[in-house]
Design a protein with these regions (language model features):
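PLP-dependent amino-acid enzyme catalytic core
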Residues: 26-512
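Short, Lys/Arg-enriched N-terminal segments with co-localized hydrophobic residues
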Residues: 13-27
Length: 512
């Protein structure tokens, strides 16, 4: 049984171990069957009671068997239980324990906060296991390896390089799938991340630097690959399943919300998403196919303006902006870039979460029920909101326009940052809240870069220096992403059915 849907075979580059590893990761999703190991993986899942959700089930939980739903009624959202694989969906009931499924979790930020005519709606990652949607990308990367028999959990560890939530999601999904894991992330990430990872991953490796120091993470991956035989590295920045999960799952979730909240004259004015690994941008590709008039904008920290200026630098918006262009970023679908000063999210997380800030928002006319939910926005979520506001103002969007964005995680991962800000700047009082509310109301259209065709190609070409020169990927694939983009990206999107078929066959044998 062979499912081989690779569109572009990569040619040898003569760069030895480094080239071999990163070339392997750059293939379209390899669905070749390794029968002997696949049988072992089936037996292991049978012993541990593990079943895998299909993409169709993650997109539409009504397809999930009632027996699984019954089990979930006695399982907490973050519990280490294999049935929580079926909570890798946007449709989880917003409950900490025993929740079922419902509509997509989202927040519409009121105009009293945004100051825009357009409506701004953000999907909320808080109600995924681990409190962030990155479990979706992690599952999409590891599950094909298990169902094809390419990964042996008895001899290999899954390595999850990340600037935050992806390695958390990877460590968690690895535990649910009974696979040992290694998490790699910068040393300056929030304390909550490290404390939680120590309870979940077999190894936690801190690399030098802050949010934007992804090069040091890549260097550690290369070192591990050279010195250890027990690791398989799932690099979110070049893993095509990361893009595919958001195209096939997150994009339809946005469409579902639009159908629910939009009126007869409503339009999707745009999608505004920050680029960490560029995985979520796959949802933008889906939305642009469904709503051809929609634009896709990419937010980045002004302190690290890679798209805006070919720039670099450190910043404080955890989860985005890593001084390079991810391999899985489809610039053919990207229409604009929006710079966000990292000082603003640090101010606005206080405005949204401190009592004085919430009072100021309510006094300004914001619905108290929505203000209560603003803790669903973590630092990068606030950054996305800022970018969405600037986008809506730049394009002069009106009352019939809806702008979608992403609230990847919540403030549960950043309470230490609030404490640090209080220690650094003093208690948050009404005077400071009023200042920050004025800053929010005064957001302008500075650092919004509307991209021409040539601008898009220029940004795409920046991949060369990271992925071809440094990491040994093949130049022909880089060119195919741009020159033959319909077949390249369309071929990837077309793999969902074959992958679901493999998962269904795998589960059927587990249940025998």
């Amino acid at each position: 049984m062979v499912y081989w849907l690779s569109l572009y075979a990569l040619m040898p580059t003569g760069m030895g171990l480094l080239s071999n590893y990163f070339r392997k990761e750059s293939l379209m999703i390899d669905l070749n069957i390794h029968d002997a190991q696949r049988k072992k993986n089936i037996e292991r899942c049978k012993q541990k009671g593990i079943l895998l959700p299909t993409f169709a089930q993650m997109r539409d939980p009504s397809r999930i068997p009632s027996s699984v739903k019954n089990e979930l009624s006695n399982i907490g959202l973050w519990d280490v239980h294999p049935r929580n694989l079926f909570r890798v969906t946007w449709h989880n009931e917003p409950k900490e324990f025993g929740g079922g499924y419902g509509s997509v979790n989202y927040i519409e930020i009121p105009r009293a906060i945004t100051g825009t005519k357009a409506r701004i709606v953000g999907l909320a990652g808080k109600w995924f296991p681990t409190g962030a949607h990155k479990v979706g990308a992690a599952y999409a990367c590891l599950s094909p390896e298990l169902v094809t028999g390419r990964f042996d959990p008895t001899t290999k560890k899954a390595v999850w390089p990340s600037t935050g939530n992806y390695c958390r999601g990877g460590a968690y999904i690895s535990r649910l799938l009974s696979c040992p894991s290694v998490a790699i992330l910068p040393a300056e990430m929030s304390r909550e991340r490290f404390e939680w990872l120590k309870t979940m991953a077999e190894e936690v490796i801190a690399t030098p630097g802050c949010e934007s120091n992804v090069k040091e993470i890549f260097d550690k991956c290369v070192e591990l690959q050279k010195t250890r035989s027990d690791v398989v590295i799932f690099n979110q920045f070049d893993q095509l399943p990361n893009h595919l999960w958001h195209y096939a799952i997150t994009g339809p979730a946005m469409e579902e919300v639009f159908r629910a909240v939009g009126g007869p004259n409503s339009h999707v004015g745009g999608i505004v998403l920050s680029s960490g690994s560029a995985g979520t941008l796959g949802s933008g590709s889906y939305i642009k196919e469904k709503f051809p008039g929609a634009k896709l904008a990419v937010g980045e920290a002004l302190q690290c303006p890679t798209i805006l200026e070919n720039g670099f630098g450190g910043h404080r918006i955890e989860g985005i902006g890593d001084k390079h262009i991810p391999w899985i970023h489809n610039f053919r679908d990207t229409d604009a870039a929006v710079g966000v000063d990292d000082e603003l999210p640090m101010r606005f997380i206080r405005l949204f979460n401190e009592p004085a800030g919430r009072k100021a928002l309510i006094d300004a006319g914001a619905d108290p029920a929505v203000v209560e939910k603003l803790e669903w926005l973590g630092i990068s979520g606030v950054g996305n909101l800022i970018a969405a506001i600037k986008f809506a103002k730049y394009y002069e969007l009106g009352e019939d326009d809806i702008v979608f964005t992403m609230f990847t995680d919540s403030m549960a991962m950043y309470q230490s940052r609030l404490a640090e800000l209080t220690a650094e700047r003093g208690a948050y009082d009404q005077r400071q809240a009023d200042r920050d509310l004025d800053r929010l109301a005064g957001l302008s259209v500075d650092h919004v870069f509307e991209m021409t065709h040539v601008d898009k190609r220029r940004a795409h070409n920046l991949k060369y220096f990271t992925w071809i020169e440094q990491l040994g990927k093949d130049l022909s694939e880089l060119r195919a992403q741009w020159d033959d983009y319909r077949n390249y990206w369309g071929g990837l999107h077309g793999q969902v059915g074959a992958l679901d078929g493999l998962i269904e066959d795998f589960n059927a044998e587990v249940l025998r």
